[in-house]
């Protein structure tokens, strides 16, 4: 079982504010789709609510919540272990948020798909500190500069351990 975390993070690890992503980067949305399509995705309840309770198409959507989630295209799990038991064993599992789930799953992850956004605004939700682990090695990195569609500089990075 390969567990990966995918997130867009600001310079100070902000990932959200008021249950929304504080920036809009169409290229990052394409990157997210490319790296999660046809895979199992795990998310927490607040992330589920942030996507308006709509499962992401062409993915197995697994939501971790103490409150039961009833939706025909979603698997509800009340713990991380139950969520992992719901996954397809031979596929890469993509953890898509939020902060609590990232923090709990970081220990088990072997890959991080990060979009570093040159953003210094406020937030109330953060990605966990991952740089303290010296075992993470960058295996892919691509810089993008802001343009008419993407108002911030950003960089795609994949780390592995």
From Swiss-Prot:
<feature type="binding site">
    <location>
        <begin position="15"/>
        <end position="20"/>
    </location>
    <ligand>
        <name>NADP(+)</name>
    </ligand>
</feature>
<dbReference type="InterPro" id="IPR001796">
    <property type="entry name" value="DHFR_dom"/>
</dbReference>
<dbReference type="Pfam" id="PF00186">
    <property type="entry name" value="DHFR_1"/>
</dbReference>
<feature type="binding site">
    <location>
        <position position="115"/>
    </location>
    <ligand>
        <name>substrate</name>
    </ligand>
</feature>
<dbReference type="InterPro" id="IPR012259">
    <property type="entry name" value="DHFR"/>
</dbReference>
<dbReference type="GO" id="GO:0046452">
    <property type="term" value="P:dihydrofolate metabolic process"/>
</dbReference>
<keyword id="KW-0554">One-carbon metabolism</keyword>
<keyword id="KW-0521">NADP</keyword>
<dbReference type="GO" id="GO:0006730">
    <property type="term" value="P:one-carbon metabolic process"/>
</dbReference>
<protein>
    <recommendedName>
        <fullName>Dihydrofolate reductase</fullName>
        <ecNumber>1.5.1.3</ecNumber>
    </recommendedName>
</protein>
<dbReference type="InterPro" id="IPR024072">
    <property type="entry name" value="DHFR-like_dom_sf"/>
</dbReference>
<dbReference type="GO" id="GO:0046655">
    <property type="term" value="P:folic acid metabolic process"/>
</dbReference>
<feature type="binding site">
    <location>
        <position position="28"/>
    </location>
    <ligand>
        <name>substrate</name>
    </ligand>
</feature>
<feature type="binding site">
    <location>
        <begin position="96"/>
        <end position="101"/>
    </location>
    <ligand>
        <name>NADP(+)</name>
    </ligand>
</feature>
<feature type="binding site">
    <location>
        <begin position="6"/>
        <end position="8"/>
    </location>
    <ligand>
        <name>substrate</name>
    </ligand>
</feature>
<dbReference type="InterPro" id="IPR017925">
    <property type="entry name" value="DHFR_CS"/>
</dbReference>
<feature type="domain" description="DHFR">
    <location>
        <begin position="2"/>
        <end position="161"/>
    </location>
</feature>
<feature type="binding site">
    <location>
        <begin position="44"/>
        <end position="47"/>
    </location>
    <ligand>
        <name>NADP(+)</name>
    </ligand>
</feature>
<dbReference type="GO" id="GO:0005829">
    <property type="term" value="C:cytosol"/>
</dbReference>
<comment type="pathway">
    <text>Cofactor biosynthesis; tetrahydrofolate biosynthesis; 5,6,7,8-tetrahydrofolate from 7,8-dihydrofolate: step 1/1.</text>
</comment>
<feature type="binding site">
    <location>
        <begin position="64"/>
        <end position="66"/>
    </location>
    <ligand>
        <name>NADP(+)</name>
    </ligand>
</feature>
<dbReference type="GO" id="GO:0050661">
    <property type="term" value="F:NADP binding"/>
</dbReference>
<comment type="function">
    <text>Key enzyme in folate metabolism. Catalyzes an essential reaction for de novo glycine and purine synthesis, and for DNA precursor synthesis.</text>
</comment>
<feature type="binding site">
    <location>
        <begin position="7"/>
        <end position="8"/>
    </location>
    <ligand>
        <name>NADP(+)</name>
    </ligand>
</feature>
<feature type="binding site">
    <location>
        <position position="59"/>
    </location>
    <ligand>
        <name>substrate</name>
    </ligand>
</feature>
<comment type="similarity">
    <text>Belongs to the dihydrofolate reductase family.</text>
</comment>
<dbReference type="GO" id="GO:0046654">
    <property type="term" value="P:tetrahydrofolate biosynthetic process"/>
</dbReference>
<dbReference type="GO" id="GO:0004146">
    <property type="term" value="F:dihydrofolate reductase activity"/>
</dbReference>
<keyword id="KW-0560">Oxidoreductase</keyword>
């Amino acid at each position: 079982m390969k567990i990966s975390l995918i997130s867009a993070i600001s310079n100070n690890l902000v990932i959200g504010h008021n249950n929304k992503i504080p920036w809009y980067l169409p290229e990052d949305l394409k990157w997210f789709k490319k790296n999660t399509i046809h895979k199992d995705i795990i998310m927490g309840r607040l992330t589920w609510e942030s996507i308006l309770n709509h499962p992401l198409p062409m993915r197995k959507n697994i939501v971790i919540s103490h409150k039961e989630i009833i939706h025909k295209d979603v698997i509800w799990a009340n713990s991380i272990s139950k969520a992992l038991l719901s996954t397809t064993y031979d596929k890469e599992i993509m953890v898509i948020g939020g902060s609590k789930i990232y923090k709990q799953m970081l220990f088990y992850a072997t890959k991080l798909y990060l979009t570093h956004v040159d953003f210094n605004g406020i937030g109330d939700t953060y990605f966990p500190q991952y740089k303290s682990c010296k075992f993470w090695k960058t295996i892919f990195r691509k810089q993008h500069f802001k343009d008419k569609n993407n108002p911030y500089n950003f960089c795609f990075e994949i780390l592995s351990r």
